[in-house]
Curated annotation (Swiss-Prot):
This is DNA-directed RNA polymerase subunit Rpo10. Its EC number is 2.7.7.6. Its main location: cytoplasm. GO terms for biological process: DNA-templated transcription. Pfam families: RNA_pol_N (PF01194). Its cofactor is Zn(2+). The gene is rpo10. DNA-dependent RNA polymerase (RNAP) catalyzes the transcription of DNA into RNA using the four ribonucleoside triphosphates as substrates. Part of the 13-subunit RNA polymerase complex.
Amino acid sequence: MMIPIRCFTCGSLIADKWQPFITRVNAGENPGKVLDDLGVKRYCCRRMLLSHIDIISEVIHYTRPI
């Protein structure tokens, strides 16, 4: 869905790093190097960014009106 605001494990703020991360990775940079440049050092935070799949555009079609 949408990237969580904080890491599930340590509580560190990660949402502010999502857009620069995905932009640079889509441009062809190495994800590990991008995370290092953004200051994401903990492996729990790194996995939150590396393993996230943004599927909100697919799920939005299945919502029903309230």
